[in-house]
Amino acid sequence: MRTILRALLICVLAPAAAAMAQGNPPPAAAAPPSNPLSAHNKTIYGGVKMILLRSAEKMPEENYSFKPTDGVRTFGQVLGHVADSQYAFCSRVLGEKNPAPKIEETKTSKGDLIAALKDAFAYCDKAYDGMTDTSGTQIVKLMGADTPKLGALSVNNVHTVEHYGNLVTYMRMKNIVPPTSDPEFSPRGKN
């Protein structure tokens, strides 16, 4: 048995020893991606945009005025709120005055809300596209607190996902499978 183990060990180590004797350096480690923090944040944002827009498209227009109980937003108002919030968060990062389009208060139709949501995401795309790990450390005021720009974009992602969770409830109550549970949509399959 020991002879077999020695033979296996020699077979495994001999080529490595020969390579080292010839002066071949070990393989170089892959270079880390540039701006890994901002790139990851942008990837999350891309997924969040996709599920929000898909939710807006899946819900029939007659359900845009639906709300599960009194005291909460309608499905359409949630979409309008998310669109307004894109401007609020990303204008801070871009150093611009918030356009404050008041979408939640002024848009009610499915077509208008989807268009407004797409416009709001296009506005935010500029903030995510221009972000680097270095520029992400610059401080902006967000809800009265000093916040790194990258943190503000992370809060935007979290806020949007929070409201996606609301939309999931609305869709389930109308027997609509939400995007992240739809095997035809979700890259992970059925959740």
State each model region's role:
Residues 1-6:
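Positively charged n-region of N-terminal signal peptides that target proteins for export
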Residues 42-53, 63-102, 141-191:
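Short, contiguous alpha-helical
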Residues 44, 106-141, 147-164:
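Acidic/histidine-rich alpha-helical segments that form the ligand environment
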